[in-house]
Amino acid sequence: MNAQHIAETLHALGSQAKAASALMARAPSAVKNRALLALARRLRDNTTALQADNARDLERARAAGLAEPMVDRLKLTPKVLETCALGCEQLATMGDVIGEISGMRQQPSGIRVGQMRVPIGVFGMIYESRPNVTIEAASLSIKSGNACILRGGSEAIDSNRALARLVQEALEEAGLPGDAVQLVQTTDREAVGHLIAMPQYVDVIIPRGGKGLIERISRDAKVPVIKHLDGNCHTYVDDPCDVAMAVKVADNAKTQKYSPCNASEGLLVARGVAAEFLPRIGAVYAAKGVEMRGCPETLALLAGVPGATLVHATEQDWSEEYLAPIISIKVVEGLDEAIAHINRYGSHHTDAILTRDHMHAQRFLREVDSASVMVNASTRFADGFEYGLGAEIGISTDKFHARGPVGIEGLTSLKWVVLGEGDIRA
């Protein structure tokens, strides 16, 4: 596909999406829910075929030498597909926020003023690896009354094409336009440049991938961007804490799955509990093959752990997103140092405190500058499905418009509604 053909194709997709967005914006809730349920059914009915398409992507990825954590992100296992189907069903049971009017109040002039929640219109989604994002984005787009143009990574092209076909079939079965969800079929990177530079069609871009991709899009886009940056998440073990609980949570936050952006990459431990806690969590990590990169005090406390892989941490380790069985560990004086460390080195994604002190917990919630802050829970809960959003289109580390897991409301905006009875301004 030459440059001119790519440009023409993207503009055609944009025009079709814009037309479809007008129909989606006024679609009744029951019709949108019918499409979501049809999609859930198709995902279950086509699990075997989808895995065959996915197998081709996995084979190419391994042949190309893609790192195993990245290959893991490509997998469409039965569990992943079932989670996607459940997400669609959960969205279908949720209330429809489109058209809701809030804050209606009488003004001294006589008019009544409120705000109505409406779809954004058309969003472009650019993402790498995870093909399940195709379903998450499509289902949220349907529920929120938007249209979307999806551009997945070349490494998942067969999986994404198969999933996009199912989405369009479900839309058409429900009587909605198939063009409301479109996939950019070419793997040529030039397509991204066109997608992010079509303000006449696209209202917002949502990139989800590596730091380089997101920085490039943020720099070059001619439409607003909702960024999903890296997940350098932290778990802070406070003094006082329930050490047994802290071991359980710190283990889950790191090892339940290594590749997601909400896995803890940094472990901070208050000096008062370090001697008791670190050998216990160190033994757990060692048994699971997790490399521990620590400060000198950490390494001294872990020196007696059988089978432990210990490495001196560098300054870079404190801000690193590993997406692998590696964790940085630092002993800190207490809460103040932990908060300062997280705000300096973290990515403002998700951070947790494990504590018995209510005041410490409240300070952590107020002062840690992250999209999600947690008390006595694993950072792995930072997820739209776990938050009851049905699905998420990403986890925004921005502070404006949407922050944290972006669900239905993150894909809407508010417009002012003014009601009068022939009122005129004096």
UniProtKB/Swiss-Prot annotation:
Keyword Magnesium applies: no
Broad EC category: oxidoreductase
GO terms under biological process: L-proline biosynthetic process
Catalytically driven reaction(s): L-glutamate 5-semialdehyde + phosphate + NADP(+) = L-glutamyl 5-phosphate + NADPH + H(+)
Primary residence: cytoplasm
Keyword tags: Amino-acid biosynthesis, Cytoplasm, NADP, Oxidoreductase, Proline biosynthesis
EC numbers for this chain: 1.2.1.41
Subcellular locations according to the entry: Cytoplasm
A GO molecular function held by the record: glutamate-5-semialdehyde dehydrogenase activity
Top-rank lineage group of the source organism: Bacteria
One protein family per Pfam: Aldedh
Pathway as given in its UniProt record: Amino-acid biosynthesis; L-proline biosynthesis; L-glutamate 5-semialdehyde from L-glutamate: step 2/2
Record-linked SUPFAM superfamilies: ALDH-like (SSF53720)
CDD domains xref list: ALDH_F18-19_ProA-GPR (cd07079)
Gene Ontology CC annotation, any one: cytoplasm
Family that this chain belongs to: Belongs to the gamma-glutamyl phosphate reductase family.
Function: Catalyzes the NADPH-dependent reduction of L-glutamate 5-phosphate into L-glutamate 5-semialdehyde and phosphate. The product spontaneously undergoes cyclization to form 1-pyrroline-5-carboxylate.
Protein name stated in the entry: Gamma-glutamyl phosphate reductase
The species this protein was found in: Paracidovorax citrulli (strain AAC00-1)
Primary gene name: proA
